[in-house]
Amino acid sequence: MPAYEFEMRHRGSGEKLGHINLRIGNMDKIVKYGGHLGYDVYPEHRGHHYAARSCQLLFPFAMSHGMSTLWVTCNPDNIASRRTCEIAGGTFIEIVDLPEDNDQYQEGERQKCRYRFEL
């Protein structure tokens, strides 16, 4: 699946804050379990909504690839990521159980929250 990865950088200082990636396409395992967007903000920069803003900045880019809906998933106990999805404009849809053959299940994860973003 085609994907892009970008650095999150502070607009004023240029300091690296984390990274974000966008997966292009609608494979079932991405839509249901993995999500189109993934992000990580370095611990010392958390709490400033950098991930939410970075997600929003990628929406036009996703649209330029013909995407009209994006999915983001996170662990149910990851309150910060759930809040990021809400701040970025996502709609909580459901919590799903991961199938046993899913890579994330093999890593010990069992469920994912699914958020939908209509572009």
Residue ranges and their predicted role:
Residues 62-73:
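Conserved GNAT acetyl-CoA-binding A-motif
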Residues 19, 31-44:
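Conserved acetyl-CoA binding element of GNAT-fold acetyltransferases
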Residues 1-32:
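Acetyl-CoA-dependent GNAT
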Residues 73, 91-107:
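Conserved catalytic-core motifs of GNAT/GCN5-like acyltransferases
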Residues 77-94:
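Conserved active-site alpha-helix within GNAT-family acetyltransferase domains
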Residues 3-7, 19, 38, 71, ...:
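Short hydrophobic/aromatic beta-strand element in the GNAT-like acyltransferase core
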Residues 39-41, 47-64, 83-87:
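Conserved acetyl-CoA-binding loop-helix of GNAT-fold acetyltransferases
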Residues 14, 49, 66, 78:
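Conserved G/P- and acidic residue-centered "switch" motifs that form tight phosphate/ATP-binding loops
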